[in-house]
Amino acid sequence: MTALDLSSTVGVVGTGTMGQGIAQVALVAGHPVRLYDTVPGRAGEAAAAIGARLDRLVEKDRMTAAARDAARARLVPAGELAEFADCTLVVEAVLERLEAKQELFRALEDIVGEDCLLATNTSSLSVTAIGGALRSASRLVGLHFFNPAPLLPLVEVVSGFATDVTSATRAYETARSWGKTPVACADTPGFIVNRIARPFYAEAFAVHEAQAADPATIDAVLRECGGFRMGAFELTDLIGQDVNESVTHSVWQAFFQDVRFAPSLAQRRLVESGRLGRKSGHGWYDYTDDAEPVEPHTAEPADRPAYVVAEGGLGPAADVLAMIREAGIQVREEDEDHGTRLVLPSGGQLVLADGQTSVEFRDVVYFDLALDYRRATRIALSAGHDTLPQTLSEAIGLFQALGKQVSVIGDVPGMIVARTVARVIDLAHDAVAKGVATEEDIDTAMRLGVNYPLGPFEWSRRLGRDFAYDLLDDLHLRDPSGRYAPSLALYRHAYATEKREGAS
């Protein structure tokens, strides 16, 4: 099944930010577009707003004046739904209320032709549930655009339980013909992005709730060490704490309160206090005019160690050994492999985050996972109460000698980046095993939908088969709530190459 012909009329119901954005996308692609809103006059106002945005595209040389004029001529505000009778595709972008969407599509069934494709832009409701009220849900598909729709390339094409392959394929190809990057997924809570992205927020909030680090430090580590474009606290302030918490709560409830998706009490308190982020002037951060910028915790300069002893290859942090040598610090290598660790002159150990805690060992400092140790500008370290001050000082001095800012956080297993990435990888493997989407589509969705530096499977391949599983298994031993229990899919992935002779 091919994409809709450009002569096909596209109807958009709902004229808020998303409705206008979707209408603009279809319009610029070349379709005639009809806009409808239940509030009289709103469709005309939305058409004028879209026209103004087209003017700005002309001013920026992204559109010719002739193309703008032609697009304006194709955009028609509708006074009633009956004017959608000749539409070949209708996309709804109304309030996220199941009853409202069901009522709308029931009305559309009596208006449009049998070959008209119906699409919902829902981000949190079940496509299957929406279609449950229709006489024939086979032509209903989810088309989840990301805001702002004209700018962001990703579209999740969601098949409900009754959606037929022809409808899903037609929606997919149409989105692609509009210049978007579609990904196909099953109707699951959160679809791809809002399902797999939950740990990015949840683990940052958990580290904060454990009093291990403040929001500014956690955000800085996620950006400068993890390679994420924004930290979890600043991003949720931008999204709106109420909006982000609502999505988290919706996914958690849809998964029957699965602890892996549990909301954050700290975020709940923030919402209850009215601190919703940028839009209210205060969230995790203060956005009032006279507010002072909050700086991350950064360690004072410390002396570099004269040497380190390498025991093992440091696994995903192998580049650190080369960087130490390049910094002029002697590396002594031991033949016996005791794991991925460095021994400092104090006798203390420097170990890559592995889901254990410093307090379990005599004299250990953990360092966090980095997307790219060479490009990272900040590294997080954690130490227990029994860690010698000299050991911590040497660890700080070592990474400072490599050109890194150092943030010392509390002794939490898995630290910040490592536990976040491990959980994202786990949810991604679980989603594939349950038929939600392919590995390729999940990687694409996470890179384009939430700007991750790598897709979960790309990250998994870089870290090695067992990194995420082993870290989460260690975390699960220390927090047996089930939050960190590795999925069966991740277990299979981690040990796919290890075979036993038989059952005992």
Descriptions of predicted regions:
Residues T15-G16:
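Glycine-rich Rossmann-fold phosphate-binding loop(s) that bind the pyrophosphate
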Residues R42-E45, R56-L118, L125, I329-S358:
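Rossmann-like NAD(P)-binding element
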Residues T2-L4, A29-H31, K180-V183, D187, ...:
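NAD(P)-dependent Rossmann-like dehydrogenase/reductase catalytic/cofactor-binding core
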Residues L35-T38:
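Conserved acidic E/D residue at the C-terminus of a beta-strand in Rossmann-like folds
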Residues G19-Q20:
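N-terminal Rossmann-fold NAD(P) dinucleotide-binding loop
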Residues M63-V76, S138-R139, K180, R362, ...:
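A short helix-to-beta-strand connector/capping loop
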Residues E103-L154, S159-E173, R341-L392:
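Rossmann-fold NAD(P)-binding glycine/threonine-rich loop
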